Amino acid sequence: FYDEYEQPTLATYKNQDGKLDTRFGTLPSFAKKTKTGYCFSDMVFDCWNNEAVYASAFGGNISISPMGSIDCDECQKHYSAFEIDESLFDEPNQSDYHSYNCNALASPYLNRKIADIKCDSRHIHCLIRNCTDAFERPEIETYNYVIIDRESDTRETFDFPDQSPDERRVGYGLRRMNDGSVTPYYISKKDAGITVTTVGPIS
């Protein structure tokens, strides 16, 4: 399966008739060793200014290409939001194949996930969730904002402000402004109501 077949993770469909147009993307590289198949194949996608950026949520690998050649390997540029040391993964026993035991062996090392992604002409913006378990829980989990320079391929990571004692975080995200710039934000619930706080924009 891993060596003889393609493993697309995303697809586009035609507006006219809804039929499949293009399949693209690939499984995270650790899927072969862990035998987890599509279990950790979550993807994030954004399109802006006729460019597409998409990433393996658990693998951290990012691809960007013109929308018109989204399935062209030679037309893509590649970046990374974070790295995974695949030597940490145990190879499952064959008796565990086709079972959730393969997932259980891999999941302790998949403690980061790209929750949102956006691009502009200069940067790729990523919202990183630091996972505590399979269920997203903004009130107890921490998030980071990662910004990647598309020209130099350098990466910076920023923390969101700590929660105050009277605050309950209910969500995080990336917002595109009218001029195309991207701003991270978080949503809080307090006694006075719900507030949305932007962080940045960071230039």
Name these PLM-found stretches.
Residues 174-203:
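Blade-level signature of beta-propeller repeat domains, shared across WD40, Kelch, NHL, RCC1
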Residues 1-4, 128-141, 189-199:
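Short, conserved, GDST-rich strand-edge loop motifs in beta-rich repeat architectures
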Residues 104-150, 154:
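Loop/turn-rich, solvent-exposed surfaces of beta-rich toroidal or solenoidal domains
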Residues 4-65:
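Loop-centered beta-sheet repeat module
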Residues 5-17, 64, 140-153, 196-203:
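Beta-propeller blade signature
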Residues 49-51, 121-124, 179-182:
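Short coil/turn segments that connect the beta-strands within blades of beta-propeller domains
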